[in-house]
Amino acid sequence: MDLRVIDKSDTELSIEIAGEDHTFMNVIKGALLETEGVTAATYDVNPEQSGGQTDPVLTIKTEEGVDALEALEDGTDAVIEKADNFTDAFEAAA
């Protein structure tokens, strides 16, 4: 997975995530929408200027005083925690 920051301000971040598809992008978007201080999280695989399918571009917008990059870190930590909890539950059930 390769990441490329496209645009960054204190309350907004657009980042290209190479090699990922809707499955991963929906998971990270969902976690971000549950993250405190995040006002919007979306992704696009067909930006208007691209002329077709591209690597997904994730865009995060946050409340004033909430750094968008830190919100992304919080969202990814939440995904990791959910995956770990699922693994533990699966192993306990097996």
Curated annotation (Swiss-Prot):
Catalytic reactions on record: RNA(n) + a ribonucleoside 5'-triphosphate = RNA(n+1) + diphosphate
InterPro entries in the record: RBP11-like, RBP11-like_dimer, RNA_pol_Rpb11_13-16kDa_CS, Rpo11-like
Molecular-function annotations in GO: DNA binding; DNA-directed RNA polymerase activity; protein dimerization activity
GO biological process, one term: DNA-templated transcription
Location relative to the cell: Cytoplasm
CDD domains: RNAP_L
Function: DNA-dependent RNA polymerase (RNAP) catalyzes the transcription of DNA into RNA using the four ribonucleoside triphosphates as substrates.
Family affiliation: Belongs to the archaeal Rpo11/eukaryotic RPB11/RPC19 RNA polymerase subunit family.
Record-given protein name: DNA-directed RNA polymerase subunit Rpo11
Organism: Haloarcula marismortui (strain ATCC 43049 / DSM 3752 / JCM 8966 / VKM B-1809) (Halobacterium marismortui)
Protein encoded by which gene: rpo11
